[in-house]
């Protein structure tokens, strides 16, 4: 496998101007690395100062929020304890009212949707799912007719409506 791959990178020679162009890139990179070290160090210091400033200000803001929350809870807790016999049932009642209104609205929308579908089906339009309903109606109608025929056959067999040869034991009439 090693024989398949060239060992040196200069197998494909470049045209003279391309070789000069690419050789300049390497030299520019070396010059950038010599001068870029100071630049990257000052950039790292600027990043660190910015991060410390942003982090510190966010830490102060979160501390103020925590202190404000603790003070608000300290003030509100006695009020909540005093008014809890009134507030808890009131909140439960409000929750039940909201649940009732939302559910009745949902049921109303569902009813309007169903009535709209029935209207479209009754007027001859073909709403979505009507083909399944027609198929189920045809299957059910076929089963009803089959049961009706069987009931009529067994009713005639019990009342003696068939020929004498069919009434004997062991013979069955099939349709």
UniProtKB/Swiss-Prot annotation:
Membrane topology classification: Multi-pass membrane protein
Keywords from the UniProt entry: Lipid droplet, Membrane, Repeat, Transmembrane, Transmembrane helix
Superkingdom, taxonomy of origin: Eukaryota
Residue ranges, annotated region (Polar): 1-47
Transmembrane domains' residue ranges: 56-76, 78-98, 99-119
Sequence repeats: 17-26, 27-36
Compartment annotation: Lipid droplet; Membrane
Record-stated family: Belongs to the oleosin family.
Function, in words: May have a structural role to stabilize the lipid body during desiccation of the seed by preventing coalescence of the oil. Probably interacts with both lipid and phospholipid moieties of lipid bodies. May also provide recognition signals for specific lipase anchorage in lipolysis during seedling growth.
Name this protein carries in UniProt: Major oleosin NAP-II
Organism for this UniProt entry: Brassica napus (Rape)
């Amino acid at each position: 496998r090693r024989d398949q791959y060239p060992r040196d990178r200069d197998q494909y020679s470049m045209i003279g101007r391309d070789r000069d162009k690419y050789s300049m890139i390497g030299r520019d990179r070396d010059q950038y690395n010599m001068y870029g070290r100071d630049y990257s160090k000052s950039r790292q210091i600027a990043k660190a100062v910015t991060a410390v400033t942003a982090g510190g200000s966010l830490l102060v803001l979160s501390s103020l929020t925590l202190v404000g929350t603790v003070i608000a809870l300290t003030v509100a807790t006695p009020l909540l304890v005093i008014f809890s016999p009134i507030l808890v049932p009131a909140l439960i009642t409000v929750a039940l009212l909201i649940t009732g209104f939302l559910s009745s609205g949902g049921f109303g929308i569902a009813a309007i949707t169903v009535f709209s579908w029935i209207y479209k089906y009754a007027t001859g339009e073909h709403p979505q799912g009507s083909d399944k309903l027609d198929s189920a109606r045809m299957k059910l109608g076929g089963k009803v007719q089959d049961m009706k025929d069987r009931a009529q056959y067994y009713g005639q067999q019990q009342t003696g409506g068939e020929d004498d040869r069919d009434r004997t034991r062991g013979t069955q009439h099939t349709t």
